């Protein structure tokens, strides 16, 4: 097992390194800008497979991973399971706009900190990220 080497020391300054995974470019851009306003360093990936590549390239060097559930190639749940297996200290948040996907995520309470239901406001996102990073 490898331990995620995040940047928790930055949290005093409200800055974290976040991996954002979503297959919709407009959503990625909007969420990235919103998180950067809070001072977070955000790396994006366009699907679960790309997200896992980014995570491995950084040797787990993220404080938090925020991922959509429904994506091509590898969905967010498969990504969360693989990420937690390799980087057990990684904090994971899921996002979904589908009730059935939210139900699938309920069984992952041991590895997922929270599930955001789309649509959500930027204020909701920022508050959820702040709580997750403080946990």
Language-model-derived ranges and their functions:
Residues 78, 85, 98-116, 123, ...:
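Alpha4 helix (beta4-alpha4-beta5 surface) of REC/receiver domains from two-component response regulators
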Residues 46-50, 75-79:
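Acidic catalytic/metal-coordinating carboxylates
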Residues 60-66:
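Active-site beta3 strand of CheY-like receiver
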Residues 29-37:
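Charged docking surfaces used in two-component/phosphorelay signaling
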């Amino acid at each position: 097992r490898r331990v995620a080497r995040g940047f928790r020391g930055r949290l005093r300054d409200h800055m974290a390194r976040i991996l954002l995974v979503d297959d919709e470019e407009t959503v990625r851009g909007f969420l990235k800008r919103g998180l950067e306003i809070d001072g977070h360093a955000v790396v994006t990936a366009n699907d679960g497979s790309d997200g896992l590549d980014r995570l491995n390239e950084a040797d787990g060097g993220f404080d938090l991973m925020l991922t959509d559930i429904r994506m091509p190639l590898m969905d967010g749940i498969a990504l969360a399971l693989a990420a937690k297996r390799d980087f057990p200290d990684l904090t994971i948040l899921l996002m979904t706009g589908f009730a059935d996907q939210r139900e699938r995520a309920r069984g992952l309470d041991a590895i997922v900190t929270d599930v955001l239901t789309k649509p959500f406001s930027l204020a909701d996102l920022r508050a959820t990220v702040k709580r997750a990073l403080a946990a």
